[in-house]
Amino acid sequence: HVRSRRQRQMCIRDRRVSDPCYERDVWCCGTVDHCKLGTWEAGVLKTDEGEWGTRCAVLAVRHKDTGPDFNVIRLGKVRKVACKCVEQSFEVGVDSGQAGFFDDAFYQNDTVFEELPAPGFAIGDLWYRHVCDITLSKMSAGVLPYGAVSSSGFGDGGYTCYTHADENGVIDFAFIVFI
């Protein structure tokens, strides 16, 4: 089933797609350029993987006014949607069991969390600790200021990001397929 949450305003047109543990210049992450400005929403498709339990199969973000509905990522439809979307040229590498979409201007920026309560996770800088609190929560996914993140399916590996553009060529929907 798909669960969604609202995300904050997007300030710039570039979205970093990455494991939050990576620095900007690592080879296995990338940016999606020319994203629509405004409020974005995030949704995660969780699937029952038998002995592995319930896992995050797909993390998606959409512009709240124009992006495709989250129903398109439901099990069985995600591959069909991928054919209508553009596969991005970068690999979404994962080494910390999580990946997400982040406003590139605020990626790894501790100041977005300065006014919030301290995170429970104790390793890394303030930004990374807050991100880990989200993926270590019961839902294994959620939103943060200027981003969305989820656990990555079965964990570490390389994954694919797809994007959808509106009639003007502006990105209004993107997703990472983990399973």
List each language-model region with its residue ranges.
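Helix N-cap / beta->alpha transition motif
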Residues: 18-19, 31-33, 62-63, 95-97, ...
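Single conserved hydrophobic/aromatic residue that forms the stacking wall/gate
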Residues: 1-12
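Extended, charge-biased low-complexity segments
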Residues: 22-81, 92
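Acidic, proline/glycine-rich low-complexity IDRs
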Residues: 100, 105-179
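Intrinsically disordered, low-complexity, compositionally biased regions/tails
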Residues: 34, 42, 47, 80, ...
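Short, solvent-exposed coil/turn segments at beta-strand boundaries
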Residues: 53, 96, 167-169
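Surface-exposed beta-loop interaction hotspot
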Residues: 58, 62-126, 134
